[in-house]
């Protein structure tokens, strides 16, 4: 299985980079992982709704450059469907069983994901109704993917 994470913004803090490296190493037993960072746009203070949409569209165009036709695209979005870890494990496993072995998870910037990306998405997933920093969320996603593979394989970890 090939898993691509396309995220807006770069990780700058060493502790976040270390966590990403650790989960990337752990996941190498289960899948080929590719993490792509696209440049984020600066959001001016008090940006209007239309300015925010323009920023999301610019970031969205950068993301689209990395999405192939054969990818099953999962957009991480507050309006998406929620599921628990075991359900997420089945979701990823079933994608692989149905021949969808190239999965792309999209993490938007601080303003969210563009409408163009949401239209392209095959599935919209919500981890929580809470908002998280997108840099931290990348680690949360990696951990859930790792947890999902452990559950799939019947290996201890998830309790």
Swiss-Prot record:
Disulfide bond annotation, renumbered to this chain: none
GO molecular function: rRNA (pseudouridine-N3-)-methyltransferase activity
Chief place where the protein resides: cytoplasm
Key words of the record: Cytoplasm, Methyltransferase, rRNA processing, S-adenosyl-L-methionine, Transferase
Annotated S-adenosyl-L-methionine binding sites: 76, 108, 127-132
Subcellular localization: Cytoplasm
Ranges annotated as spanning the membrane: none
Similarity-based family: Belongs to the RNA methyltransferase RlmH family.
Protein name as annotated: Ribosomal RNA large subunit methyltransferase H
Organism annotation: Clostridium kluyveri (strain ATCC 8527 / DSM 555 / NBRC 12016 / NCIMB 10680 / K1)
Recorded name of the encoding gene: rlmH
């Amino acid at each position: 299985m090939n898993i691509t994470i396309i995220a807006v913004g770069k990780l700058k803090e060493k502790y976040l980079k270390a966590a990403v490296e650790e989960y990337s190493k752990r996941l190498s037993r289960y899948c080929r992982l590719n993490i792509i960072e696209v440049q984020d746009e600066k959001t001016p203070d008090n940006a209007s709704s239309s300015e925010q949409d323009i920023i999301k569209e610019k970031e969205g165009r950068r993301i689209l450059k990395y999405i192939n036709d054969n990818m099953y695209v999962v957009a991480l979005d507050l309006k998406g469907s929620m599921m628990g870890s075991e359900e997420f494990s089945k979701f990823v496993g079933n994608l692989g069983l149905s021949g969808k072995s190239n999965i792309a998870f999209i993490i938007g910037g601080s303003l969210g994901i563009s409408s163009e990306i949401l239209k392209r998405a095959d599935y919209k997933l919500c981890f929580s109704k809470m908002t998280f920093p997108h840099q931290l969320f990348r680690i949360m996603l990696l951990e859930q993917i790792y947890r999902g593979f452990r559950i799939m394989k019947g290996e201890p970890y998830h309790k």
